[in-house]
């Protein structure tokens, strides 16, 4: 009986300590109300345009499907994924995936280039602040404006023009899938420098689109038959 009571008290103490630590972390991290200003400064630094316009449906759907399929329901973070990230950081095995779009945006805007437990903790707190400071369309817009897509392209507008020669609202499903697949490994999966890797990512994202019902399996099969050279035929020359 005493053992159970002690265990219960220890559990309560652990919860209280965690809540206190989380509260201190929220106080120690900046407010997220300046995310737009940071995004603009980020794009100026990299010589990229800051369109600040709504993200087109196809790219938004492909991004959510492959990077964060619970984007519309989650509180900004995925607790299980956070534990995987911490484990990956401690063991130096990478972040193990699973960071939400909010966390990824927090990393890009507030802790770029940092890969340690302190940075991961800040990203969790900032992700929650971003969640409650901006609407989902605004988060997607900020993400698309600062994400790196490889080959020197920062932001969706520059990547869409650079790879396909079209503005983002004219992306086809296979083009949108290819771009959405680049955000995790923009250099390694660059379809110009590493076409096989780029195609593999396109296939993965297309599979996710089928899984959520955005495209049918026959449609996906047809899209994946389009040669990469055809998708990239107008690279660098945007069409109005």
Stretches found by the model and what they are:
Residues 1-240:
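Juxtamembrane regions of bacterial inner-membrane/periplasmic proteins
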């Amino acid at each position: 009986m005493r053992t159970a009571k002690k265990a219960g008290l220890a559990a309560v103490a652990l919860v209280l300590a965690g809540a206190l630590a989380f509260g201190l972390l929220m106080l120690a991290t900046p407010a997220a109300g300046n995310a737009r200003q940071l995004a603009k400064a980020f794009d100026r630094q990299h010589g990229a345009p800051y369109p600040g316009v709504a993200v087109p449906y196809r790219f938004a759907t492909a991004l959510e499907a492959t990077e964060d399929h619970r984007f519309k329901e989650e509180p900004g973070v995925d607790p299980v994924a956070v534990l995987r990230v911490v484990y990956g950081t401690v063991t130096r095995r990478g972040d193990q995936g699973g960071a939400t779009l909010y966390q990824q945006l927090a990393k890009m805007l507030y802790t770029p280039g940092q890969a340690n437990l302190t940075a991961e903790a800040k990203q969790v707190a900032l992700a929650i602040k971003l969640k409650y400071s901006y609407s989902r369309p605004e988060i997607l817009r900020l993400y698309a404006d600062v994400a790196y897509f490889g080959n020197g392209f920062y932001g969706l507008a520059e990547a869409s023009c650079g790879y396909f020669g079209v503005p983002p609202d004219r992306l086809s499903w296979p083009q949108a899938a290819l771009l959405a697949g680049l955000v995790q490994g923009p250099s390694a999966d660059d379809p110009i420098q590493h076409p096989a890797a780029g195609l593999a990512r396109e296939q993965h994202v297309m599979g996710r689109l089928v899984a959520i019902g955005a495209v049918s399996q026959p449609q996906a099969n047809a899209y994946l038959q389009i040669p990469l050279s055809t998708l990239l035929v107008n690279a660098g020359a945007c069409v109005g």
